[in-house]
Amino acid sequence: ITELKEDRQNQTPFFTKLKEYAESNPTPFDVPGHKLGRNSQELIDYVGQNMFLLDSNAPLGLDTLGHPTGVIKEAMQLAAEAFHAKKAYFLTNGTTVGILAMIMSICRAKEKIILPRNVHKSAINALILSGAMPIFVKPDIDSDLGIANGLSFSSVKKAIDRHPDAKAVFIINPTYFGMTSEIVKITEYAHEAGMIVMADEAHGADFYFSDKLPISAMDAGCDISATSMHKTAGSLTQSSFLLTQGDRIDHSRLQSTLNMLHSTSPSSLLIASLDVARKQMYFEGKEKIDKVLTLAKKARTQIKQISGLEVVDKTYVHERGNFDFDELRLIIKVSELGITGFEAYKELRRKFNIQLELAESHLILAVLSYSTTKDDIDHLIIALKDLSKRYYRIRHKLPKVKFSYSFPETYSRPRDAYHAPKKEVLLSEAGGEVAAEMIMIYPPGIPLVIPGEIISEAVLEDLNFYVENGSTLHCDLDNGCIKVVDKENWPKWESEEEDEF
């Protein structure tokens, strides 16, 4: 059986067929307009002709993503097998479209969904599009690092008990910083309550290929998971999988929802990269992840010896009551150097050409993957030692991290506020108003305010703090204003009437 499985997993149905087409030298009277790259010399000189030959638009024999019956279907079946799932769907609009599709296909208007407040913006957008009612659960907060972590079982159990009519529970596995929740216990309890369990696994694709990383959503029993193959497992940016198992998912409705959200011209390059990356991770993932975990362990040992720096490890995580942690995330606290994470991020990029994943007020985040090398780690250590040499003891350490993770009071469903009459107000004068748009810091793309929440002074202070320290504020307007509900012209304001949809 194992040999048969390996024979299957050694295949790349879509990529193989795509290569056959590219090598057949067709006369193109179809789109795309570059016609196999005939007039794209500047880009060809850099990336090569083959990229254009592979950039086809579903010619005969290459199947259709919206209704797969041939090589795409075969490739998705192999992906499902590799990822311990019943079905797998290719996503060429990123995990974002997977999260949109799972929530929209499962939750109808006004149906409740239990989810952590530190969800990605795509989950909030799905609430707006579906009309579902969020029941937010506060994540565990690490006040020393200034980050939101996973969910405890007790907090989710309390929400399930209080809202037994909820349709689904949504879990992040893991967070941007690699922290996981008690996903097995949460899933089992939610299933006992008759709820569907969804997972945002944007940063956990590699969990399926190593027992030394946290448990994956499918292995934990979740019904559906969106996982970014491109973030940690080697496919091209914007390519992901949507995985399902069990009998709780309406696959016909799910496919229909995906077809509503996906482009009708999906990138063959992205699909091919998913096909090939799946094969590579199946055969090489475990060994490569083992090697990079060894590098990560050595990196932590070295960083701990650098004056003014601290690095998170599993001992730190467990001592603070968190469940598990992806050790391929190097969370490095730099505030003892007297500089912010934002300053360290810029210094490492400008002086050492090191591109980190993100910065927060007191820390920086470096993401390792199966492709990280010893030379990469050595270069990072040299750069961190340089930071320490230049800043430690020269400047005073930063004050204790300012991180309250204030939760604004919810007044209405996100959908109601999004469609309500609006007006523009200065962000500095928005206290007490009902938000009509999302306001977030990016990365990581977690909204500090969502439509339907009452903007508090505490949230405004948090936003100002991030902006003053170099973060990018994402909102709809660029004139210092935000959109809020025009309460005087909104019949719902101080009314018991509910919107119909």
Regions found by a protein language model. Name each.
Residues 1-70:
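N-terminal "arm"/small-domain region of PLP-dependent enzymes with the aminotransferase-like
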